[in-house]
Amino acid sequence: MIPILLCLVVGVADGDTLTVLCKGSEKMKIRLSEIDAPEKRQPFGSRSKLSLSSMCLQKKAKIKPQAKDRYGRIVARVICDGVDANEEQIKRGMAWVYDKYVKDQSLYSIQNKARASKKGLWADNKPIKPWEYRRGNKR
């Protein structure tokens, strides 16, 4: 079992990636697990980043590591000031449940509520899933 890390959020790259500074450690990139936020060039990409920033930036966070991704980032559940940031991004309509990696099935009911009330990205008629957007926009 990987221990929970207590850190300060010092940067937000986008709606699902943070930079944290943990006691006695260097800065680390954290990828929020089980969610996928719109890319920067997608509709709601910048709003998703702002949402995560308002929730976590310059706040203490509990990082619950689950894995490392292919980019060397720690994939984790993140709790900022008592708020589950992964879940809250879904609730606000600022991220999708990442079908390929989801373990917490309750995230789907949260996403369905956000979709039904047209929150965030669900205000668009046909929002494009970030993983489909990336597939269609490879460099």
What are these regions (language model features)?
Residues M1-R139:
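Small beta-barrel nucleic-acid-binding modules, primarily SNase/OB-fold domains
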